[in-house]
Amino acid sequence: MNRLVVIIATLFVPTTYSATGDSWCYHDPSCDDTTWSTIASEHCNGSRQSPINIVSASAVGDETLTAFTFTKYGDNSTMNKIKNTGKTVKVELTSGVQVTGGALSEVYDSLQFHLHWGNGTSVPGSEHTVDGTRYPMELHIVNAKSSHNGNTTTAVTDSTGLAALGFFIEAMPGNATGSPPAWNTLTSYLANITLKDEYINITHAISLDELLEGVDRTKYYRYLGSLTTPNCNEAVVWTVFKDPIKVSQDLIDLFSTTLHIDHNSTSALMTNVFRNIQPGNDWVVTTQGRPASGASTMCSSLGLMALAWMLLRV
């Protein structure tokens, strides 16, 4: 691959939509996520903060959570640039990539995707957890309502202005390396963006569908939450897919062993780039299926039986 590295000053589709710039971080106690409620207090102290631990048994059935329609996710020329932001790896998407359905209120434009990870096999780094389990990585596709015309400044002021598609990533079993091919191609660009603000044009044919191979995109969890980085705007319809993407461990390890958080190679490697689980605020997490009316009826019946037993003992 030709090394065409450019350092840019202008922003394309921001990952964080943050007004606080470099004032927040993951790696330093003076600016890590324990301080964000002070750094960006307007939203990071909110009542619908993300990420969350999803308790699968508590997810409420919702028959409106139908299948999505993905536009241009199969197009292998929609990935424009890949960039080291100093906090993640972000891939900018070309116009026309969209998602609708899945009980979303309108068509959403897919703007970019980025990733969260820990530190190789020693620290898993997904943001969301399911029943307390944290996956090695998590991919987020960030989408904005088409009615905002790509204006993320207005989108973050709309309680459902953004839709985030979250995909867990786990290691393939066995000793596979360099797999799947699409991920092998994507991660081959990391060597060209080792330092903060470096980016390179993506010239290989890669589609979103190829990166999401093996995921049943009809099975997911849904809740209303926030951006997981400052300013933590509570403007996100979260969809977290149940099936993980399977990637060979050697490719997962590249993220925590190749990228640096600053503009020089002596700066720290980019590890543990995820926000910790946020305190419970009575989120309603839904999933496909009918509401568990039978379960509530059973609970009511058991309650009446208990009351009757107590009255008999009086």
Regions from the PLM with identified roles:
Residues 2-314:
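Alpha-carbonic anhydrase
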